[in-house]
């Protein structure tokens, strides 16, 4: 509570409650995004999301980033993770960009790209998972 209220105390004291609320809401979505990416990473690591991977990692190179790579000796899958409701068009664009990034990763086997997001319009037509799919994997 202190981490949220104290930095905004001056604005709260003069009645700028709505502005503080919007500022906190924006930072919450950023926080949820980081936690969602961590969740996907752990679910892949523990093989709750199982693509036959032996290893899971993040990748960075010259300002480019791939949120999660899951791979074995023969196959590498790149995942872009978004805590956002995506339209079909947005998701396709993100997958295209992810394919471009994955081309830069030195790997001799098969490569694939997936997107995992809060929700994805038309996900059935894409290599995609959403929050509902992840929920089904953990509900017994």
UniProtKB/Swiss-Prot annotation:
Pfam families recorded: DUF234
Top-level taxon in the UniProt lineage: Archaea
Matching InterPro entries: DUF234, Restrct_endonuc-II-like
UniProt cross-references to SUPFAM superfamilies, sorted A to Z: Restriction endonuclease-like
PANTHER family, A to Z: ATPASE (PTHR34704:SF1)
Record protein name field: Uncharacterized protein MJ0425
Organism per entry: Methanocaldococcus jannaschii (strain ATCC 43067 / DSM 2661 / JAL-1 / JCM 10045 / NBRC 100440)
